[in-house]
């Protein structure tokens, strides 16, 4: 897992496969009011079901715990990742809806 600081407010964690392709990524954004917003999680289809998302999630969480211990963490997640968040102490605050036109 490689950590990349995009700018002063976005940090991305990238998993690189043995063949040097991007296997997955997660990131977070620093927001006003001491808020860390988790965003942009993705694991390449060829690398799913191998524990990569958990490794990325854990790397990001450890980084935030060490560097931003007094920040509130927010995240929007899908049904497929909700249990991972709950296992890590997150609570569902509200349901959101995806709409498009």
Where do the model's predicted regions map?
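Acidic/histidine-enriched, beta-strand-rich ligand/metal-binding domains
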Residues: 39-40, 48, 84
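Residue-level recognition of the GNAT/N-acetyltransferase active site
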Residues: 44, 78
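Conserved active-site tyrosine of GNAT-family acetyltransferases
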Residues: 85-86, 90
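Conserved catalytic-core motifs of GNAT/GCN5-like acyltransferases
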Residues: 74-76, 91-101
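A conserved beta-strand-loop-helix scaffold within acyl/acetyltransferase catalytic domains
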Residues: 2-12, 17, 24-42
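Conserved acetyl-CoA-binding loop-helix of GNAT-fold acetyltransferases
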Residues: 49-62
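A structural microfeature
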Residues: 23-24, 94
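Conserved GNAT acetyl-CoA-binding A-motif
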Residues: 64-77
